[in-house]
Amino acid sequence: MYKRQVVGSAIAREMSRYRLKIGVLEKNLDVCYETSGRNSGVVHGGFAYDTGSLKARLCVEGNQFMGQLAEELDFKFIRCGKVLVGNTAEDMETLKRTIRQGEENGAAGLELIGKERLHQLVPAVVGEFAMFSANSGIVDPFNYTIALAENAHANGAAYYFDHEVTGIRRDSEGIYILTTPKGEFHTRWVVNSAGLGCGNISDMLGICGYKVIGSKGDYIILDKRTGHLLPMPVYPVPSNTYMGIHVTNTTDGNVIIGPNAEMVTDFTYYGVPQENMDYLAKSASDLWPCIHKKDYIRNYSGILPKWVDEEGVIQDFKIEIRDDIAPRAINLVGIESPGLTAAVPIARYAISLMEEREKLTPNPGFNPVRKGIPRFAEMTKEEQEQMIRQNPDYGQVICRCEKVTRAEILAAIHNPLGVDTMAGVKYRTRSMMGRCQGGYCQMRIAQMIEDELEKRVTEVRYARKDSQMFFGRVREEA
């Protein structure tokens, strides 16, 4: 497998239900550094996609059992609902069409609401009416992706980080040989779930002709003190191809603003220009006038891989096996939004294509349950006292903003996937995600990584292999 991180990990987890030897080749140093960790974190209801499309069908399926999945894998999911806010007669007609389409797609919990009900749901919102989607929700995209990967790993899937696939060929017996800078991998089956790289991998398989462009969206993160003002995501009335700049609450209390949409060919640049931040804030303020620069704590961007036709029209998910060109290769192209919501149904659909061609034997030892790192800050006082008695490391707070303890940092450093970066700790614990953005805890965490993993300080990386943080010590010990 070569993978888009959340979908690829979902495929690895679903494949581990069977007696298969699974290897996941990942070009990055963790599973949530690109599209899967750079999005709004919204669990969509399934009303925004063309009836009959895979996007619609798989999104509705993913929404329906996200709660069960969150219980099994111990990640944060809140079914808080969502509103699409309108003001004009044209907006009203668009929302009515959206509800009809959603009902045809099987999406439940959709209704038009007036101004009074809208302000009961979201008191700070500006608008005359809205479509309320009761079944929409929010998820922690980092923890969700990591949970899928850790459960896949616990059930036998091997993860190979820093293994970018640079070539694919087949030998005389039809075995695929995948070339990486760290060696070759031989396999009967290949899954292309490479996200932004799906077009390149598809070409390597000989399945040519897919045009994949990037849609870059920028975001602003607001301080947690704004969270009580936004109980659910607030969207404008969408266009045919774009959901619009929205404001979204998060599972941990922050608010995020965005995204805009800019078509790009460079899939590596994640900078956020000041003018884009100003545009995001101005646009979102029309919906939710609670945005102040003093509350900005960080910005980020994400890029979605969109498969388009010759006229530039965005296409549906493509999930296929081309027996005539690349037998035993599952090819996924254009897996963009709602990929986060639909990840597990996408995985099951892909595996169903495999089952049509190969008898799969169930894995009797498969365990769907994964336990995450306990969050000290979310425990009751009595629970905290008990944890400290059991492990004194819970009594030492390393990240003051998010109240993350030494015990949690240690658990993240020694994570099952063997990720050893600063960002790996950040995404597993929320350390460095608070108001000071690591001003207090970052050096302490770097020191813990150095000590626990017996690394030199110059070997500590932030997220990517070229993200060296330190180049030596000011004072070397004698």
Model-derived regions: residue spans:
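Conserved small/polar residues in nucleotide/adenosyl-binding loops
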Residues: 1-5
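Flavin-dependent oxidoreductases
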Residues: 10, 168-258, 262-271, 282, ...
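Glycine-rich FAD pyrophosphate-binding loop
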Residues: 16-38
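Dinucleotide-binding Rossmann-like beta1-alpha1 core, especially the glycine-rich loop
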Residues: 41-117, 121, 127, 244-245
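Short beta-strand to alpha-helix junction loop
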Residues: 50-60, 85-94, 131-150, 270-275, ...
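C-terminal catalytic lobe of FAD-dependent flavoproteins
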Residues: 113, 141, 242, 251-252, ...
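Helical element adjacent to the flavin cofactor pocket in flavoenzyme catalytic cores
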Residues: 131-189
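Local cysteine-cluster metal-coordination motifs and their immediate loop/turn environment
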Residues: 395-409, 429-447
